[in-house]
Amino acid sequence: MDYYLLTDLAATMGYHLAMSGAETFRVEDTIHRILRAYGVECEVFAIPNCVSVSLEAANGKPLMIMKRIGFHGNDLEALEKLNALSRRICAERPDVDEAMAWLEETMQACRSYSTGVFYLGSVLVGLGFCLVFGGTLLDCLWAGAMGLIIGLITRFMDKQEANPFFSTLLAACCMALPAYIAAGLGLMDSPDAAIIGALMILVPGLPITNSMRDIIYGDTNSGIIRVVQVILTALAIALGTAAAWHLTTGVYGLTGSTTVSWHPLAQAIAVFVGCCGFCILFNVHGRGCVLCIIGGVATWMLYLLWGALGCDIYAANLFAALFAALYAEVMARVRKCPSMPYLVITILPLLPGAGVYYTMSLGLEGNMMDAVAKGLETIGVAGALAVGILLVSSVFRILNRRIHGARTLES
């Protein structure tokens, strides 16, 4: 057996998983399982920037392969197909050359939306979530156009492999400028709602969920790295919108904002539209797309229900996050695929993008006490979401270990 080719197969599989947005645990576990299927023990170390695999060949010589991980994507289609391929390789244990050919065929077979459909997804996210955050129908149209601006800029910057911080800052600034100008001209009712709706595209949903899962699985280094990425993204969003605010305030002054409290059914339709957009942006296809959208709508409805029953914002987010995480884990086992696609889309309506924006807005207006209070509230909401996800993930991790241990004893 060619140990180098086998190690390269496992490392390449881990590389593609990481590039598609997989959490660190999945990358390391997949590599371990593939090599153990061929009777080889190994050591694996993965962080968001690289994956390293080392083992001892049959002749006793050590062998190590490291792959540098560059630009990370949000390709949940590839993530699901790669997970299915790893299961197939472990079950059938084909010749290493054949397994490598399977991997190449899988990557070529991964579907992706066209550029036009990608831009449509950006429009749908802005349009849908603007209404959720209290925008009027006119604001929703503006938010859709602003979402398109974000899509155009991020798509171009991704092709140039530009720094993510600068890309996010530029997209946030260019998106917010027309909103503040339109509000100053009286062409928009609620610029805040329109901006927040469009900003949901930039909210780092995948890094947030991955950081939580990395930490609960004991991959502290990776978890901390992802947390820093999340903080930098939030800072870029705040700086970008703040720059647009400063550029327009001197001309138009402070603009007012009128929000609308929509009926829960209208909000359900809006979340449906927004989640459709996110399924496009995260490259989710087929039945999985439908299940992700159902999960997102159900999560938001439960959040509204808990709020109507008298729960405060933290408890409502906690209970909704518990449902979202449970839904993702159950769907993953029903379809025998990673829970990540379901969790990312399902939890997105709860992410505190509005809190980040209002904290920045209040600070710029000089209301520092209110800004601090809103910032602490945003941190509390993020903490409630983290606790909900971690609780469910911990329970399922314990159950998986017990089931796997029982199967090992039986064999």
Language-model regions: role of each:
Residues 1-101, 105-107:
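Soluble N-terminal domains of membrane-associated systems
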Residues 97-110, 124-135, 151-163, 246-259, ...:
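Short juxtamembrane and helix-loop transition motifs at transmembrane-helix boundaries
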Residues 112-207, 280-282, 286, 291:
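Core alpha-helical transmembrane segments of integral membrane proteins
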Residues 116-120, 140-145, 166-170, 227, ...:
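Hydrophobic alpha-helical transmembrane segments
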Residues 128-133, 149-158, 174, 178-186, ...:
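Alpha-helical membrane-inserting segments
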Residues 130-146, 191-204, 255-270, 308-323, ...:
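Structural signature of hydrophobic alpha-helical transmembrane segments
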Residues 185-191, 248-262, 362-374:
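Membrane-interface helix termini and inter-helical loops of multi-pass transporters
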Residues 194-202, 210-235, 305-411:
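C-terminal transmembrane helix-loop-helix hairpin of multi-pass membrane proteins
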